[in-house]
UniProtKB/Swiss-Prot annotation:
Protein name: tRNA (guanine-N(1)-)-methyltransferase
Organism: Francisella philomiragia subsp. philomiragia (strain ATCC 25017 / CCUG 19701 / FSC 153 / O#319-036)
InterPro entries: Alpha/beta_knot_MTases (IPR029028), tRNA_m1G_MeTrfase_C_sf (IPR023148), tRNA_m1G_MeTrfase_TrmD (IPR002649), tRNA_m1G_MTases_N (IPR029026), tRNA_MeTrfase_TRMD/TRM10 (IPR016009)
GO biological-process terms attached to the record: tRNA N1-guanine methylation
GO molecular function, one term: tRNA (guanine(37)-N1)-methyltransferase activity
Taxonomy, superkingdom: Bacteria
Subcellular localization(s) per the UniProt record: Cytoplasm
UniProt keyword terms in alphabetical order: Cytoplasm, Methyltransferase, S-adenosyl-L-methionine, Transferase, tRNA processing
Amino acid sequence: MKFGIISIFPEMFKAINDFGITARAIKDSKVSIKCFNPRDYTTDKHATVDDTSFGGGAGMVMKYEPLSQAIKDAKSTLGYNTKVVYLSPQGSVFNHNKALELLENDSLILLCGRYEGVDERLIQDYVDEEISVGDFVLSGGELPAMLVMDSLIRLLPEVLGNKDSMIEDSFYDGLLDYPHYTKPAVLPDGNAVPSVLLSGNHKEIAKWRRKQKLIRTYERRKDLIECLCLSEEDKRIINDYKIDKVSTKGEKNEK
């Protein structure tokens, strides 16, 4: 998969280029990342990429011309039909399903805004989709772009050393992940790993993990549960958990 990054801070992407799964994917030629700095497409001696906002208001706005030229250059490198995604608080919220949707593209151009954003005319002329990573404000689109890239790259075939790691990730089946434990089996204070995980019974371990995924998702993200088509067994697990919770709460109140 090929990524084109439009950013005035291309150096930031060394963090994703040089470390971890992404670095390995680049080394193995499964992914390529090329940055296009809008400052390289300016004509004034100060390499100006922003200006004041028409109508007044605080903050600067990124200029149309340098950004449009950078996008054109990126398209000439990655392909003229490459989708342009603008990382923006006004966009649809990024999630696992959106990652799978974006993964259908062989290449993507990620536009990283700064200041108060980019000239609206650039969005109208060049941007295919706006994506947000959440309802909060960041200084620019570089960190969201890295987040999106990391999410997509780990979903590519053969990028993860163990394909089961991807299948068992949170959100892969619409549920949060189950709890994980490692050595020692018992901490000095006596806090022990659930015995089923030490049993060697893979069927029981799988059942325990499924139960934990359901309970954790019900507790922390009921909105996800509501979107799933649960089996009768899954529904029973959640219902039993709710009954146990009410019963436990009642016992505490009596004390």
